[in-house]
Design a protein with these regions (language model features):
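Extracellular attachment/recognition segments
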Residues: 695
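Single conserved hydrophobic/aromatic residue that forms the stacking wall/gate
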Residues: 1-12
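Bacterial Sec-dependent N-terminal signal peptides
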Residues: 11-44
């Protein structure tokens, strides 16, 4: 196990629906522990992209990344849950720890709050055992498969998953005379606390039950069915725990578990549909196939093996969520707590304050088949709870983070043509923007959010987020011919100007008297007790992605704007003892470890200096992303941190939250080919590309000279090739006024 195992590759003939069981390599660990490993076909290596994924990236530091078995956008994230020791265990796992409390079926990835961990199994030596030691050297993980060798008890644990079901296999050592596990419905991760649980059905080879809980998501409901490959005896222990005793320890015990947020009957149907048989290796192979299919939507060429591994790991991480939140029969539990029948796939785990910036614009490039269902999810959430999602989890609105982040995502889908019910989408956006809660009433009354009237603080961050969301509403209103609405929301989108102090050149808290808050220190950050959200004035002054040219004018002219922007990457200062740990990945005061900074590097293109963006983009990719468990500069944030890398590595980034204007940066890949579907591809080719040749010298789009430092979404969707000639010195490319975004 100390040697890195060869990665699984699914042969092309499997894609032709011939699905043989791949060669099982017997790997003897301690004398008698088989390990599922698959033969690596060198001839197929180029199409086996899972071999380039390192799931451990981000499992240390502040990455908070999930480690375990799942499939793209699945409801199930089956993996180890460790004994929580603090904030860095939000996913239930951290590289620094070695104490397991169970193998749970649901985990979050990259969040700043811990949740889930539902329906856990743990092999034990006796009924009172609640923790098991393990060694990271005895783990084996790849997309869709997790395994670990435990010593006490002496058992080899293997896990895989489908969208709505988990599959376990436990192989007990020859010295194990009493094979047993604990089924734990009490334990949860972080804020999660059970409110009701029970085994509602107990049979010789199956149990079924429910687990309801509260926490970050206030009203969580999970129903489950667990089937065993051999007879077991189930005995109640203390609260929420049952002892599962295995009849024959000489045979592996397999457990199939189906989950549903609706009912036991639906959990059973999910399980029977997705894992009808007991062929563990086939499910592992199907998971690998699912990952390869999604990873292949972007094929990159590079001589840098580390960059390739970081790229495909980022792709892998970007597909943990949104998570499917409807059953195979179409039923789902809505935001109103009721069961609904849908004609679309419903989703949850919507970390929108993070993901509207890059993860969702990335989805519009590579997951177009999902977009109508994502839009339907948003519209139905609005109809069920009266507003678009803010941070939705397990069908619950958590209201976590500031602003109206559901608006940019839905507006982008409307403007890019993926929403059939445009009027319904617009109504959801408009009414979400016109509410009274979360500071919106103050915005309507004063035209901004005065710090002395909002008890929840963070008024600058809220106000800037509302302004960019209002701009998105205005764009959709304009598209639909709603002139009065377009005018109203376009004016409200300019409210960001209220927070700008021309004397200091920063966005600042402002009171009802029209005066800025004093005293003022642009470096200071007091978590949840000042005018900013997980940041300071240096970081929030640039949060005007919808109107960069308007922001430039506030500084007086382009030169003053550039001078200030240059300073961002140089200045250092004391943020104070109460700064948020999310302020990380610093280059000067630029904080790549947190989302509000993510568009800032690309602002140089707006003022005709794309070479400065290129230098900083390369620096950020090289310094903030590593092929290591501590390889992220901050929380993964449900795919946003990875999505920034994916887009930037290809040379693209959508700064404006909605509309499809992708800024051209400095691709780290020599070639990236995006599969658009319908047999069309869009390729970005970098000629003469290297670690020194980071500046675009010239460009061609489909063979014709291209001078703009941005490209529109609809132009990419036609298919074709963007060819960039790179060099080691800044050039005049993209600098003319007509060529700027």
């Amino acid at each position: 196990l100390r040697r890195r195992q060869r990665q699984m590759c699914i042969r092309d003939r499997m894609r032709r629906r011939i699905f043989p069981i791949l060669l099982l390599l017997a790997c003897v660990i301690g004398g008698d522990y088989p390990q599922a490993a698959f033969a690596h076909d060198k001839a197929q290596a180029t199409s086996c992209l899972t071999q380039f994924v390192n799931p451990r990236i981000g499992t240390g530091g502040h990455g908070h990344v999930f480690l375990g078995a799942n499939v793209p956008f699945g409801y199930i994230q089956l993996g180890p849950t460790e004994h929580t020791r603090g904030w860095d265990w939000c996913s239930g796992y951290h590289q620094s720890d070695s104490i397991l409390i169970g193998f749970g079926h649901q985990h979050l990835s990259g969040t700043g709050i811990g949740e889930l961990g539902d329906v856990a199994f743990l092999p034990v030596t006796d009924a009172h055992q609640k923790k098991v030691l393990f060694h990271h050297a005895n783990e084996n993980v790849r997309p869709g498969y997790y395994a670990v060798k435990l010593q006490q008890p002496n058992v080899w644990v293997e896990l895989t998953a489908t969208k709505r079901a988990g599959f376990h296999r436990y192989t007990f050592g020859a010295d194990v005379k009493k094979a047993q596990l604990v089924l734990d419905l009490f334990q949860g991760i972080g804020w999660d606390k059970p409110t009701d649980y029970a085994l509602d059905e107990v049979k010789e080879t199956a149990v079924a039950g429910h687990r309801f809980s509260t926490g970050w998501a206030k009203d969580q409901k999970n129903f489950f069915v667990a089937e065993f490959s051999q007879p077991v005896q189930v005995q109640p222990l203390d609260s929420g725990r049952w002892l599962v005793q295995v009849a024959d320890a000489t045979r592996p015990l397999m457990i199939k578990v189906g989950l549903s947020a609706v009912s036991i009957a639906n959990a059973r149907q999910n399980l029977q549909t997705e894992i009808p048989d007991w062929n563990f290796h086939q499910v592992v192979a199907q998971a690998d196939e699912a990952w390869n299919r999604e990873l292949a939507k972007v094929k990159v060429e590079t001589s840098d093996s580390i960059a390739r591994r970081i790229f495909y790991t980022a792709m892998y991480h970007s597909m943990t969520a949104p998570s499917v939140f409807s059953d195979v029969n179409g039923e789902y539990r809505g935001a109103d707590g009721k069961v609904h029948q849908g004609d679309f796939t419903n989703y949850t785990t919507l970390s929108l304050w993070d993901t509207y910036r890059a993860a969702h614009p990335l989805m519009t490039l590579i997951h177009k088949e999902m977009l109508p269902d994502v839009a339907s999810t948003f519209i139905n959430i609005y109809r069920q709870q009266g507003k678009l999602p803010v941070w939705h989890l397990m069908g619950n609105e958590t209201d976590c983070m500031v602003g109206n982040p559901g608006i940019p995502v839905l507006a982008d889908l409307v403007l890019k043509g993926y929403v059939k019910d445009k009027e319904g989408a617009y109504e959801a956006m408009k009414q979400s923007a016109l509410r009274e809660d979360r500071g919106l009433g103050l915005l309507k009354k004063y035209g901004y959010l005065p710090y002395d009237k909002d008890p929840e603080m963070e008024t600058v961050a809220k106000g800037l987020e509302y302004a960019l969301a209002d701009d998105c509403v205005a764009k959709v209103a304009r598209l639909l011919g709603k002139k009065a609405d377009a005018k109203y929301f376009a004016e409200r989108a300019q409210s960001y100007r209220k927070y700008f102090d021309p004397k200091t050149g920063f966005m600042r808290g402002i009171g009802t008297d029209g005066k800025f808050r004093e005293p003022f220190n642009p470096f200071s950050a007091v978590h949840r007790q000042d005018d900013y959200t997980e940041g300071n004035a240096w970081q929030y002054t640039w949060l005007v992605p919808h109107d960069v040219h308007g922001l430039v004018k506030l500084f007086g002219n382009e030169q003053k704007f550039v001078t200030k922007l240059d300073s961002l990457f140089i200045v250092t200062g004391n943020m104070g003892d109460n700064a948020s740990p999310d302020i990380s990945g610093l280059i000067g005061q630029y904080a790549h470890g947190n989302e509000p900074s993510h568009q800032v590097l690309y602002m140089y293109n707006y003022v005709g200096q794309p070479w400065k963006a290129a230098r900083l983009i390369r620096q950020t990719m090289n310094e903030m992303y590593k092929d290591d468990f501590d390889g992220l500069s901050g929380n993964e944030d449900v795919g946003q941190m990875s999505a920034w890398y994916i887009l930037s590595a290809m040379g693209l980034y959508q700064v404006e939250p909605a509309g499809g204007k992708y800024i051209i940066g400095s691709p780290i890949m020599d070639k990236a080919t995006i599969s658009l579907g319908d047999g069309k591809n869009f390729s970005i080719i970098c000629k003469n590309n290297s670690s020194e040749n980071i500046y675009v010298q010239s460009a061609k789009l489909n063979g014709k000279t291209y001078t703009k430092s941005y490209i529109m979404y609809q132009d990419m969707m036609k298919g074709g090739t963007l060819e960039l000639q790179m060099g080691n010195q800044p050039s005049k490319w993209g600098t003319r006024g007509a060529d700027r975004p």
